[in-house]
Amino acid sequence: LKINFKKIGRRLLRILALFLLLVLFAYVFLYIKQERFFFNPKVLDKDYIYHFDQPFEEINIPVEEDVNLNALLFPSDSISKGVILYFHGNAGALHEWGERAYIYTENNYDVLFVDYRGYGKSDSFYEKEAEIYNDAQKVYDYVLTRYKEEDIIILGFSIGTGFATYAASKNTPKLLILEAPYYSWNDLISNMGPIPEWLIDYEIPSYKFLADVSCPIQVFHGSKDFIIDPDEHSKRLKDLYPHKINRSLIKGAGHSVHLTKQYYDELKELLNNY
């Protein structure tokens, strides 16, 4: 039996070249279309009618010429202590996120949910990081037209923690709540697989923004969150700012900490103190 090592070598080289070409193609595609991977919106028709079991007001907030963000404001069940500005996660739209309103309205707060660009009934889509920061500030500016700043709480969940942390760093709300926060967007995506940092067009450095946050900071994170690892992200934030951040690890919880009794009880106590 004669083995043609040259022929085998050529085949292996062709296979390796094809593999590298596919990897390169995947990286180029990811770089060009990364917004479509990182943002996973549910698009709603402009004439979509929301239905919830509690009162709400639908609002369109202008953030740029010809760009409005659709938002829902749910009033408190009793005398309102203020408003929670809620920046949601990377999937779905307000018809789903609004189902969480009762968690906050039961605790004497109005809550404003806002859909990002490309989500729900909001216009446009994101093409650069600066648009994220612009929108976070414009939404906060809108809230200031209806509430005193000392009555505003900012809450961010998952991808929304970047929006929330930025807004808190540029303003003076009375409290910042972060649920399943990431250290930075670069770190989060790099942790998900063999994706080089230079390929990621968005940094969203939450750890930097937190340096300029002057209000109290409360972090909630599930101990079994396999999407945003609590040790790689919120623990590092706590270690970086040990005196600024109060971190609560929700035992046994995954990414959606709001589904647990521990979260609800701790949130109730927190909001009662504010």
Spans of features found by a protein language model:
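An N-terminal hydrophobic leader/cap segment in hydrolases
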Residues: 16-62
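Membrane-embedded segments
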Residues: 64-142
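Short alpha-helix in the alpha/beta-hydrolase fold that links the catalytic acid
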Residues: 100, 206, 215, 229-239
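Alpha/beta-hydrolase fold nucleophile elbow
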Residues: 148-158
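Hydrolase active-site cap/lid region
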Residues: 161-215
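Short beta-strand/loop motif that positions the catalytic acidic residue
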Residues: 213, 219-225
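Acidic catalytic loop of the alpha/beta-hydrolase fold
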Residues: 224-228, 256-257
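Catalytic histidine-centered segment of alpha/beta-hydrolase-like enzymes
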Residues: 253-262
